[in-house]
Every structure is written in structure tokens, then in C-alpha cells.
Amino acid sequence: MKKPFIGIVSKNIDYSCEADVYHWSFQRISDPLRHVIYDCGGIAIGIMPQTLRENFNKKDESESTLLTKQEQADLIECLKLCSGVILQGGIASHNYEEFVAKYCYENNIPLIGICAGYNNIIRGLGGKAELVSNPERHNREDVVYAHGCKVVDKDSLYYSIVREEDFEVNSLHTYIGTQIPSELSVVAVSDDDQTEVVEAKNKRFFLGIKYHPELLAKIDEKQKRIFERFVDECKK
């Protein structure tokens, strides 16, 4: 069977400093994410913003600069190359990511949004993601597993994949969904009742995951199964 193209939407990273006359910036793709896609039978390709902009939002909040009609059209042409799409995590979010989330929802394209990608799914569909009240508990780079995760909807795609009701996850974020759009169902929460996983039940595969399953895929089989099922759906 032909391998599906999985588009990973890039993140803008600005490495420039005052002494840098070139003001370099880059578009980043997470290695663990492209590795797990390849390992599960997909071909990972980068989806970059189609714009001449050099300055992007530096926070994980909605960006005021919107895409032009031409930039939207060009980005759609990139998305049409893909059988599925992933919105990455990161410390900043951009309007083009919200646009991708909405486009995938409206066109029933399989999508996973991870961490900031989860935020951009929520924002793209009209909801809100804001600073978490206890970042010291949820931004834990020092441990593999940071807190518990509990499935609250067993009639969900997510539960059919993980097949466990209570388990541990990592946590590397400072923003959380505070206003969930009606298009999404909350299917799992953290042990302090933060929304951990959302999904659109009327779509083929549309998941927003607050934690980072790609960082656990090598050691936690149920987390790898998320990507296996995703790639399988993208083959259809």
C-alpha cells in the first residue's frame, strides 16, 4: 500500500540577535514527530506558511496578523498534497495554524494537534486557550510522566485507541483550553481537571492532545497507537 503524505505544519523560530545583520529565522519541524510518523508507515513532509513575512508572534496566543486571500489559497494547495496533517507543539502560535485547523475540520482531513497545536484547534474553531493557573505543575521538562490523565468519554475515538481509563502522561505547557467550541468533545482530563484531550466525533480523525504523545511513543505503546491509527486512517 502506498505510504500517505503527512503534513507537519512548521513553527517559526527566530534565532536573530542585535549583532546579526541578517536577522535569521527558521521554520522548525520536530524530530520526534517526524520519526514516529515514519515509523508508523507515513511520509512526513513540512507544511510552511506561504508568506514573505519575517516577523511572527512570539507567544502561544492568537496572532493579530491574518493571512491574505492569496496566502490562504497557497497554503490550501500545500494541504491538498497531504492525506493528514499535524499541528506541532511549541512556545508560540501563528494565525496560519488556526487557519489549517479550521480548513482540516471543514474538509474532513485527519488532524492531530499537539500542545500548542491543541490550542490552535480550539482557537481555529472559535474557542479560547489561556494561561494555566498552575504552570509549575504542567510545564515539567524534568520528568517523563508529570500527572495523571483520565478518559471521561469511553464512546470516543481516543479511548478506542488508548484502551485505558487512567494513565500517566507528560506535561510541557503553560496554556490550556478554557472555552471549548461546540464542535469538539472533551474526552480526557488531567488529574486536576484540566482539559487534556478533545476530539470532533463527526470527523474521520480529529484530535487535540495537550500532552506530547510523540515524546512517549518509544516507551509507551498506547501513545504510539495514536499515530499508528492516524496513519492507517490517512491511508484510506
Q: Model-found features: residue ranges?
A:
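N-terminal beta1-alpha1 cap of cysteine-dependent amidohydrolase-like domains
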Residues: 1-116, 123-127, 136-161, 174, ...
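Short catalytic/ligand-gating loop segments at beta-alpha or beta-beta junctions
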Residues: 168-174
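Acidic/charged, solvent-exposed loop-and-adjacent secondary-structure segments enriched in E/D, K/R, S/T
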Residues: 131
